[in-house]
């Protein structure tokens, strides 16, 4: 069991482990627990009642957080033709076609997200799948990063659209803002994510879907959240 310092032990005493907090209570408390010298990211962790070994029970989706994540997202766009100008006008940080594919293949990784038009996916799959796939950066229609509307995809990512998916233990981890956010904005982002997660419930998943949820900041202890009966149905 890892040993925690005096600062962390003092923080964890502020969390009542024998109760579950509403998101509004937790959003206010997490700000009090974020005492690091930087603006900590606030994350939520959902444990799902799924069998992640079965492909028909895996959960994946996207959600536009109404107040964004507080992070500046650097977006790379792989496209060609008129879409180049459209991507640049939408605020993409780097845009290119085969030239950008080659740059990335040669080590260029100065971006946080990659979007592409369908006509570039064959080359991306051939040259970049092994590089971007393990990093979670490979464009995919399910994550809203492949499509004809490059401007819309770029604006969505810049505005705070995030992708969520379960890990191999059936847990979804997702950022919902920064410790500097107003608690009401953290709560609104959480509710948007919760709604998207409920909508993404696999038909093959039986029993209680949302088993538990915790709110935490980068350096702070986790706060157990209450889940309504409706959310667990």
Curated annotation (Swiss-Prot):
One of its GO terms (cellular component) is large ribosomal subunit. Disulfide bonds: none annotated. One of its GO terms (biological process) is regulation of translation. The keyword Transcription regulation does not apply. InterPro entries: Ribosom_uL1_bac-type, Ribosomal_uL1, Ribosomal_uL1-like, Ribosomal_uL1/biogenesis, Ribosomal_uL1_3-a/b-sand, Ribosomal_uL1_CS. Keywords: Repressor, Ribonucleoprotein, Ribosomal protein, RNA-binding, rRNA-binding, Translation regulation, tRNA-binding. It comes from the Bacteria. It holds the Pfam family Ribosomal_L1. Transmembrane segments: none annotated. SUPFAM superfamilies: Ribosomal protein L1. One of its GO terms (molecular function) is tRNA binding. Part of the 50S ribosomal subunit. Belongs to the universal ribosomal protein uL1 family. Binds directly to 23S rRNA. The L1 stalk is quite mobile in the ribosome, and is involved in E site tRNA release. Protein L1 is also a translational repressor protein, it controls the translation of the L11 operon by binding to its mRNA. This is Large ribosomal subunit protein uL1. The lineage of its organism: Bacteria, Thermotogati, Deinococcota, Deinococci, Deinococcales. The gene is rplA.
């Amino acid at each position: 069991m890892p040993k925690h310092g005096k600062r962390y032990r003092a923080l964890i005493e502020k969390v009542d482990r024998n109760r579950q907090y509403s998101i509004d209570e937790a959003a206010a408390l997490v700000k009090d627990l974020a005492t690091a010298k930087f603006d900590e990211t606030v994350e939520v962790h959902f444990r799902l009642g799924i069998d992640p070994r079965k492909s028909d029970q895996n959960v994946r989706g996207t959600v536009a957080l109404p107040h964004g994540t507080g992070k500046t997202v650097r977006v790379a766009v792989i496209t060609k033709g008129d879409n180049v100008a459209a991507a640049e006008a939408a605020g993409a940080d780097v845009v290119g076609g085969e030239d950008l594919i080659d740059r990335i293949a040669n080590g260029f990784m100065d971006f946080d997200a990659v979007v592409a038009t369908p006509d570039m996916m064959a080359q991306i799959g051939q040259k970049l799948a092994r590089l971007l796939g393990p990093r979670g950066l490979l464009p995919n229609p399910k994550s809203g990063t492949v499509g004809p509307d490059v401007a819309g995809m770029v604006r969505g990512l810049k505005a705070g659209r995030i992708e969520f998916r379960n890990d191999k233990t059936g847990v979804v981890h997702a950022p919902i803002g920064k410790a500097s956010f107003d608690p009401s904005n953290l709560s609104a982002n959480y509710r948007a994510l919760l709604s998207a997660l409920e909508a993404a419930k696999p038909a093959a998943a039986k029993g209680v879907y949302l088993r538990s949820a915790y709110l935490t900041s980068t350096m702070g202890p986790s706060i157990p959240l209450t889940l309504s009966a409706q959310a667990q149905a």
